[in-house]
Amino acid sequence: MTRVFITIDWFLPGTNSGGPVRSVANLIAAMPECQFYVFTRNTDYCATEAYEGITPNTWVRFSEHCEVYYCTEQNLSKATIAAQLKAIAPDVLYINGIYSKAFSRWPLAIGRQIGMRTVVAARGMLSPHALGVKPFKKYLFLTWMRWLSAYAHVIFHATSEVEKTDIQKVLGGQMNVQVVPNLARLKQLAPQAISKEEGLLKLV
């Protein structure tokens, strides 16, 4: 079974951040042949209170083929992510977004360092409209990333041909971009009750 390690700033049961959360949930629901490990925050977008009833800083069974690590702000570090990647030893690292230090840039650097197969979902962040918000800061960051060849080892996931064009326009036509549309919602996903049964809760 293919093991996929996903990094995303916010995930279910949080919904405040919108589309990316649902897109990732749909991806997980549509691929029961894979085992997913989602590394995320233990709070929702723009929220300060932790999710009720969910134990943070450990792997929690979310569905039959998905576990989630709800990380607290105090425990969030590059070393923590590297340790979890080493412990899980996934076949694929799937990064959501471009700019987040903890959930995009750190995983990208770690994946490159250890030679891990890495997929980056830009989530529309390289569209002309998105680049128009704080453009100078983004221009400097993306220029720096191109200079470092930071995405040379990456496969980009675009959800349309338009997004593929946006990615290659910003980062270079040589970028490996695969187009896979967002998947339709299959079923509601919600965290299952935490179980101490062997194999259902991993303490790393």
Ranges and model annotations:
Residues 1-3, 187-203:
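Nucleotide-sugar donor-binding and catalytic loop/hinge architecture
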Residues 138-156:
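Membrane-proximal helix-turn-helix segments that form the acceptor-binding/catalytic region
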Residues 162, 183:
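Carbohydrate-associated surface elements
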Residues 82-103, 114-119:
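Short N-terminal targeting/anchoring amphipathic segment
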Residues 1-52, 60:
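N-terminal subdomain of nucleotide-sugar transferases
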Residues 37-92:
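A conserved catalytic-core segment of Leloir-type glycosyltransferases
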Residues 12-13, 101-102, 116-136, 152:
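A short, histidine- and acid-enriched strand-loop-helix "catalytic/donor-clamping" loop
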Residues 3-4, 92, 108-128, 155-157:
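Active-site proximal beta-strand in glycosyltransferases
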